[in-house]
Amino acid sequence: MTTDTIVAQATAPGRGGVGIIRISGDQASEVAMALLGHIPKTRYADYCDFKDGEGEVIDQGIALYFQGPNSFTGEDVLELQGHGGQIVLDMLIKRVMEVEGIRIAKPGEFSEQAFMNDKLDLTQAEAIADLIDATSEQAAKSALNSLQGEFSTQVHELVDRVTNLRLYVEAAIDFPDEEVDFLSDGKIAGSLYRIITKLDSVQASAKQGAIIREGMKVVIAGRPNAGKSSLLNALAGKESAIVTEIAGTTRDVLREHIHLDGMPLHIIDTAGLRDTADTVEQIGIERAWAEIETADQVLFMVDGTTTDAVDPHEIWPDFIDRLPEKLGITVVRNKADITGEALTVTQDHGHNVFRISAKTGLGVEELQQHLKSLMGYQSNLEGGFIARRRHLEALELATSHLMIGKEQLEVYQAGELLAEELRMTQMALSEITGKFTSDDLLGKIFSSFCIGK
């Protein structure tokens, strides 16, 4: 990161009641002298004229001055809060740029300054963008929790535990005559198991946070003519898929992106799964399985007129056995308008079972509520944090190293190799908060921010 003084409009482009210009860097005080004729008292609102190079007034408004390191960016910061007309704001930026050495900020550069000056860690910086982009109250609350350090605190706790255990293991290695006793006394194993348990908990919360941010991928799967396309239409609230009585009508993947109370949901309708000689249908079935393997949840559609069973293993064991081990399954018994089934929601063998009529819409609202709960929707809006795909990847990598380290301890009692896996775990976790992060990754993250943030 350079030490340039940067300027940008901090409010959204366009017409508004108030417009804010933000300047951050060593020359902020020089800009204040040029435009205001004085440096405002630190952290006080100063109503004054904003003047051009000839002393003519461009606008009137509030000037706020924050002396580093006691500012958002950690640098000296000047904010000019004037009227929200775009022409006036452009004139102010042009005037600021007349001060030699000032340049326009890149997207996210103010937040990057804050990160580089240890005012924020990387998860908190990302949470700023996530708070701005939030599409639901739950997402906004979770992003705010991350901004306030909830996610970071849990990651830092894990890093501290891993670091302390690594130091203990390395101390044992330094005394080779006693190393085996150290490794087998149960203390190291106990600490390692507790770290793994804690990491599993954080990983589960992060997955929920990623769903809140990015949306849940739900695949509707089942045999031909079970009503999958009708359910897609019912959930989407429009006729997205062609529905006929002919089995195999849907031959390709159909996608709909909807919001349930602001929670993003990616619904995917797939070709009916069956053995077929039709080449085009075979391709559709292959694509269906590809979508299922990357789904967060499967709605297993069952034609209620063909079976009374509710246990998916009984309905179609080959299908269930092929599903990824940790994939969530919701059984949806369709055509309740024909079978006369009560529109109840039950649990069977650990799976939620819904009775609906996709054609008439009966029971669909209850299914929507279920999907919202799976996405982490909470009416009280308490708890949880936002997470991104890179966070999940780092947590998965950390888990992988811990499991390898566990094997080195339990099977081989190899202290050096355990210590190395703990070091790799520490690095993977530290990437989340930015303690060990490449410049390329930082550039990618901050470039996705708004200009002025």
From Swiss-Prot:
CDD domains: trmE (cd04164), TrmE_N (cd14858). GTP binds at residues 225-230, 244-250, 269-272, 334-337. It is an enzyme of class 3 (hydrolase). Keywords: Cytoplasm, GTP-binding, Hydrolase, Magnesium, Metal-binding, Nucleotide-binding, Potassium, tRNA processing. It is found in: Cytoplasm. Residues 215-376 form the TrmE-type G domain. Its EC number is 3.6.-.-. (6S)-5-formyl-5,6,7,8-tetrahydrofolate binds at R22, E79, K119, K453. Its cofactor is K(+). PROSITE patterns: G_TRME. Belongs to the TRAFAC class TrmE-Era-EngA-EngB-Septin-like GTPase superfamily. TrmE GTPase family. Homodimer. Heterotetramer of two MnmE and two MnmG subunits. This is tRNA modification GTPase MnmE. It comes from Shewanella sediminis (strain HAW-EB3). The gene is mnmE.
